[in-house]
Amino acid sequence: MRLNFLVTTMALLVAFPPPYECRAIDSSSNQPVTDPDEERQSPAVLARMGEEYFIRLGNRNKNSPRSPPDTYPEASQYSKRALQLQLTQRVLEGKVGNVGRWDGNYALRALDSEERERRSEEPPISLDLTFHLLREVLEMARAEQLVQQAHSNRKMMEIFGK
């Protein structure tokens, strides 16, 4: 069985080689360096591509090595903007519990609880109306989800016993 799997895998790898983008970078010293600017640009492009890849994945691997943001300023500018957009999407979807943990150059700052209370007490102006309504809908959806979760937990406790 294992031999059959090994032979099939080898046949597929020979028949369908991975695309050029998936192959390792050729680091042989036989090729002459033509332009020093080109040599400096390639790490920036690779860093940018890697950051975009981790942003798309949601950076699930927190221990992954990251390049320092000051190393490639143009790459860090794109990554900052992408992380801001990602955080905004997560906040709007209600997936971020504590926005303060994203504190830094890459994220939005959390509002103080007093400012949140003041905003909820004041009637929203026309520009904030959309966000006010969105916030209300998200709060209602969260409350409904908690009620449903509590109901399902009660059912499970009744079925399995206390």
UniProtKB/Swiss-Prot annotation:
Its main location: secreted. GO terms for cellular component: extracellular region. Gene3D superfamilies: 6.10.250.1920. Coiled coil: none annotated. Residues 1-24 form the signal peptide. Residues 57-79 are annotated as: Disordered. One of its GO terms (molecular function) is hormone activity. Residues 25-119 form a propeptide. The keyword Cell cycle does not apply. This is Corticoliberin-2.
